[in-house]
UniProtKB/Swiss-Prot annotation:
ATP binds at residues 39-46. SMART domains: AAA. It catalyses: D-ribose(out) + ATP + H2O = D-ribose(in) + ADP + phosphate + H(+); D-galactose(out) + ATP + H2O = D-galactose(in) + ADP + phosphate + H(+). It comes from Halalkalibacterium halodurans (strain ATCC BAA-125 / DSM 18197 / FERM 7344 / JCM 9153 / C-125) (Bacillus halodurans). It is a peripheral membrane protein. It is an enzyme of class 7 (translocase). This is Putative ribose/galactose/methyl galactoside import ATP-binding protein. Part of an ABC transporter complex involved in carbohydrate import. Could be involved in ribose, galactose and/or methyl galactoside import. Responsible for energy coupling to the transport system.
Amino acid sequence: MGEHFLLEMVDITKEFPGVKALDRVQLKVRKGSVHALMGENGAGKSTLMKILIGMYKPNEGKIIFDGEEVTFNSINDALDKGISMIHQELSPIPEMTVAENIFLGREPTFGKSGLVDNKKLIEMTRNLLESLEINIDPRKKMGELSIANTQMIEIAKAISFHSKLVIMDEPTSAITEKEVAQLFKMIESLKKKGVGIIYITHKMSELDEIADDISVFRDGKYIGTDTAKNLTRDDLIKMMVGRELNQIFDKPEPKLGEVILSVKSLTKQDYFEDVSFEVRKGEIVGFAGLMGSGRTEVLETIFGVKEAESGEIFVNGQKARIKSPQDAVKNNMGFLTEDRKLTGLFLPLSVRENMITVNIDKYINMGWLNGKRVKKDCEQQKQKLYIKTPSIEQIVENLSGGNQQKVLLARWLLKNPDILFLDEPTRGIDVGAKSEFYNLIFELASQGKAIVVVSSEMAEILGLCDRILVMHEGKVTGELTREEANQEKIMQYATGQAKMAKKLHVHNNFEQTVTANKIEIG
């Protein structure tokens, strides 16, 4: 691991009223390295970083930075020493230019006049961006940039403070695969300049590419540190949650019933063609494939979000006419969408209000909402799904990702559908929350619900599903039973390298390219 460290955080303890958030935590970061922090939500990663940048004061412990013991009373104290943080929620000023955002409050001026020297400002910004190999016009408005480019500018801003250590919090959560590659290239450039990077992520697939060292935290405690090459996925999962990988997918034997959903030759131009599959009661069918293969669009078309050009849908043997999501709901279908914040939840509303949005009719009698019954049912779902919230009146935006996803599931459980579509059901939630969610899915299947899952996580598809349909460029190229399925076979079908040898049965959208030797959990 090396003997000289850019950063040492020693025996850091932080207490809030009634809660010990950090308990004698350690962290050592080498100069010119990427040090990944792993752990579930609530493990203590964010609290530790807030102490490092001066937002919180520790109750105990010390921080040694660049060989000197330091105390930070504010974010500016940390910045002055060369520590900066790129937050997950970016907050640039959209009306300002790139140059104005980077050097806000530090603009070059004409002598004592106080007037900004715009020519010099542009020149300083251009030189900074060129040194980081960022090809963005300094005069461009921040509001015109993509999320990825906004992130690049935030990193450039951090470097403009002559930062020796940059903290990146979930930097790839909202950018494309191509943009991720661009970000990783930039990180490598920073490493060569001797900058240390603390990299917070849930995505294990990124660790092979970017991390030099990994530290794991659990329940406010430091679990351990090792080089990335010495830690397997199973090692990390066990360190993070205290359980083996096979315990996370504790799948019971399925009890399959009659065919409840049958899709025949479904086609949506420019998205997918001739998709056919069946799902039985109690069965979990998964759709795998690369980004753009058509998985999500298949679900959206069955659910009436998109209109099919041709094909038929049968529910319980009867032909179903589904032209809208309302039609799908009438056919006892439910749909957890891919982006819970954009197309699923109403973030400013309460847990209770979100739960009843598709069920409100059953609570209205003679024009009046039966608030007592609503409260009773919502409280039951809160208990049943172990939703961690002080109250069903809590604003849903304030919940963790895992609990937000449970609120969405509760919405559909109140509707009690026979067929449930889950599109990327655990995206953005940590390993422990995923394990809880998987158990809920298994329980629903044991009750006879038919479940169709789209997931970009190979381990999730393999661990959840009784049968897996693989898509490539809008077509179903393979179907595998649970016993037949493995990473290599799925990737062969997903990349078009294998010919389909079995009859059809399909599904939809498998995102980022997953190489055969990588499993992403988190």
